Amino acid sequence: MYTAASQANQMIESLTEIEFSNKELQDAYLGEAYFLRAFTHFFLFINYRNIPLIKELPKAPNEYKPQATPEEAWDFIIDDLIKAKDLLPDKNFWDAKNKGRVTKASAYALLGKSYLYRSGIEPKYGTSQTTYYNEAAAAFAEIINGNSGDYRLVDDYSCNFDVAHENNDESIFEVQFVGVLNTGFNPGFVDSGLFNDVRCKMCIMNRSRNSNSSAQVMHNWLYDKFVASKTVTGETDPRMFGSFVFNDNVSEIIRPKGMKVTFLEGKDWEAEMGSKEGTFGEQYELAMGYKMCSRKWLDWTLPPTDDAGGHFFNGRAQGVNWRMIRYSDVLLMYAEAVVMGGKATANITPLEAINKVRDRVGVPHVTEANMRTIEDERILELTYEGSRFFDLLRWGKVVELSLIHI
């Protein structure tokens, strides 16, 4: 992350010295640099909290920065995002070759997220009682109202996690992967690979069956949560099929029309696991008793070779882009910001925002916009997309729910 922040600083310090015939393009590049500097510091701060701020290129080899206070870190991140959203174009500016670059909506989304996180996290630490829910709601409303480009929920939820539908109309900020290069991690270089990519270890289908990494399963409270979510016609929530690998031939699962859980090479549960049992225990001793694992972010079209060069052998690389911020997340964060006291400025209400997310998968409307409905919906919509811990952190529920969900 600090390598990327340093590269962003290099761009910021250099771009103003270069003559551009296209001022919009110069602004777009500068906006990207401010955005990426903000994103890297945001990521570092929410994970480690006590971080130095890299605001400029070092002037000497042994130039070390002190750790910033939380207030200094948030102010720096937010200031960069305000600059970025003023400089960046909407998504229609970029041609097909540049599809997936950050946009004005990317900056507004991360800006709103920063205000929302700051408002929830800092009072829990006692560092500040100031909240920014008005600012968060206003930033999300810019996207919802279409002021920074047209975004929508794609019809098929599962299209948010595959290669074929990368950079779709729901994607607001997406980390681009050029392929499945199995070289070592080499930060700062375009050909840096992702050997030992954690995504391949998330799935029970790690082809190295004796590896501990083949036990990356979901806890059964989450399985029960999804099983309990039904469509208006009584089928299992389609998001369960887009998010996980599990046995869909058991009685509590009612398959929506056209949906079926498949493994590599299109195998169903019984063909892959050699059992009709509802857990992974027969094939994977470490996964005894668990019923599902993650499906997201894996390219299920790759060949399942068992040799050391195979894409499913002991954590080899996957080429699926990471969707860091989706439009559905923006809708739910907007609802949260308003429920927590922010001014409603979008062209839909918080309740309509929540139900818009639910409409996509055909589950019944909720009748009230409150934190309970938002918290539940974020589980169903965003599981295994990297937000759960930070959701609990800003809600002050990390310890409480960690003790329950073990």
Give the label of every model feature segment.
Residues M1-Y48, N62-D75, L81-A96, G289, ...:
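Conserved, well-structured interaction surfaces
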Residues F45-I46, P52, Y117-G126, G342-K343:
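Short coil/turn linking the two alpha-helices of tandem helical-hairpin repeats
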Residues M1-A4, F76-I78, K99, Y157-H219, ...:
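Long, intrinsically disordered, low-complexity segments
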Residues I82, R101-G278:
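An aromatic- and glycine-enriched ligand-binding surface/loop that stacks and positions planar moieties
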Residues P238-I354:
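C-terminal substrate/ligand-recognition segments
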